[in-house]
Amino acid sequence: MLNEFEEYIKGNFSDDYWYDDALFLCEDFLKHFSDLEWTLLISKMQNYDIQSQVRLAECLADVNNKYSVKILIILTQTENSNLLITCIDSLRDANFSLLTVEEKHNVSINAKKVLI
């Protein structure tokens, strides 16, 4: 399923198609990812181009699990303002109660870095 997901977020789609169809397909892919697929996504996402990272962040807005929050926090470590804004917007409704105490601490540290 990860390969199909990557085809969509890396695809050369119009904005209309992305926001009308592909975004929802990608959200559905993510909601059915195994732990292994999430781990692979985390290891691969830094190599995605900015547009693909923005699309990933957009998809994660409605995927509430510990992996989605972790990915969004990692992606906030960017110089690209569009990606940063998308991550912050997606984090707005994140369920931080899904994280362990240590993961919450790491989120706090990373959030402080973003604000500096």
Enumerate the predicted regions with their spans:
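Amphipathic alpha-helical scaffolding segments comprising HEAT/armadillo-like alpha-solenoid repeats
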Residues: 2-8, 31-44, 65-77, 97-115
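Structural detector for internal amphipathic alpha-helices that build alpha-solenoid repeat scaffolds
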Residues: 10-32, 54-64, 74, 85-102
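Short coil turns that connect the paired helices of HEAT/ARM alpha-solenoid repeats
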Residues: 15, 45-51, 76-82, 113-116
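Alpha-helix boundary/capping and short turn/kink residues
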Residues: 35, 50, 62-65, 81
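Short, contiguous, helix-prone interaction/anchoring segments in small proteins
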Residues: 38-53, 59
